């Protein structure tokens, strides 16, 4: 018996929609990363992108535990000398709530071209509306 290896052209990808209202950020991101990689499927292959497309709604209503709302700090560098920037979780939620979930999930995906391809299948929206109705996404309860 031969070991099964998924081929990129034969992988079937579904579309799912997830509501992030009241969900804990880390627990939500863990499940999203797992599904983006395709580890929930029987035909999972580490070197092939077998994951599904996921739409996340209400990113501005995601929850964190403890004092992370005020204490968690996100850093990024502009590339210029002395260009380190920082923002707290509250500031990120106020300015760009989608980035909070994108950063959390991206850190849980593989680094490299395959991980970037997986992260492109994540669509995050701050509100309750999305423009992917043509894909007929199924509701995913996490």
Swiss-Prot record:
Pfam family, one: Ribosomal_L13
Keyword Acyltransferase: no
GO biological process: negative regulation of translation; translation
Keyword Cytoplasm annotated: no
Xref: InterPro entries: Ribosomal_uL13, Ribosomal_uL13_bac-type, Ribosomal_uL13_CS, Ribosomal_uL13_sf
Keywords: Ribonucleoprotein, Ribosomal protein
GO molecular function, one term: structural constituent of ribosome
GO cellular component, one term: cytosolic large ribosomal subunit
Alphabetical list of Gene3D superfamilies matching this protein: Ribosomal protein L13
SUPFAM superfamilies: Ribosomal protein L13 (SSF52161)
Family, similarity comment: Belongs to the universal ribosomal protein uL13 family.
PANTHER family, A to Z: LARGE RIBOSOMAL SUBUNIT PROTEIN UL13M, RIBOSOMAL PROTEIN L13
Physiological role: This protein is one of the early assembly proteins of the 50S ribosomal subunit, although it is not seen to bind rRNA by itself. It is important during the early stages of 50S assembly.
Record note on quaternary structure: Part of the 50S ribosomal subunit.
Name of the protein this chain belongs to: Large ribosomal subunit protein uL13
């Amino acid at each position: 018996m031969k070991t099964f290896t998924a081929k990129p052209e034969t992988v079937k990808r579904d579309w799912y929609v997830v509501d992030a209202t009241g969900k804990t950020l880390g627990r939500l991101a863990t499940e999203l990363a797992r599904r983006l990689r395709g580890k929930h499927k029987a035909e999972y292959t580490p070197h092939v992108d077998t994951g599904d497309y996921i739409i996340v709604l209400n990113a501005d209503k995601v929850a964190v535990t403890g004092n992370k709302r005020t204490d968690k700090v996100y850093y990024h560098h502009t590339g210029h000398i002395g260009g380190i920037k920082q923002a707290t979780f509250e500031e990120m939620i106020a300015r760009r709530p989608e980035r909070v979930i994108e950063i959390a999930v991206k850190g849980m995906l593989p680094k490299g071209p395959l991980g970037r391809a997986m992260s492109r299948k994540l669509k995050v929206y701050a509100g309750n509306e999305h423009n992917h109705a043509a894909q007929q996404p199924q509701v995913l309860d996490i």
